[in-house]
């Protein structure tokens, strides 16, 4: 869901590191972060181009990007475990409705995400990459996986992972070979 001004508050804890900092690590990845950001980017591009960008050209943009991001993680020697959001808590329904531009949402089923997760999971399976479904918030399961020692870090743009107990969070990951990423380490 995100916390207002979270990144400004924790900015002293953030350092920029090469993506190779992830090498050899097991990392829980919040899949919704990539799906939603790619879908938002396409919506902006289509809006700015006055819908001249055809839907066919952008329909599977998130799948294409997922492929290249996973490929980069694997090249770095990362063992990713992708985590999918489950049912949204009632507290989040108002926020989801606002993001979708609708008056209200009756359940936390996350139909939009589930529809886009299916082809992502097919791609991950074809690449031999593990994924799992959270019962509710993916960030919560990512943090739990780290706390239990199953993964070394979390890869997400959502600070909720820290609030759920993650102590090593990476964000701003790119498939580009020389890209830096942001690392936040926090002992709570």
Residue ranges and their predicted role:
Residues 89, 93-188:
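Extended two-metal-dependent nuclease catalytic cores across DNA- and RNA-processing enzymes
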Residues 1-81, 85-87, 91-92:
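Non-catalytic, usually N-terminal nucleic-acid engagement modules in DNA/RNA processing proteins
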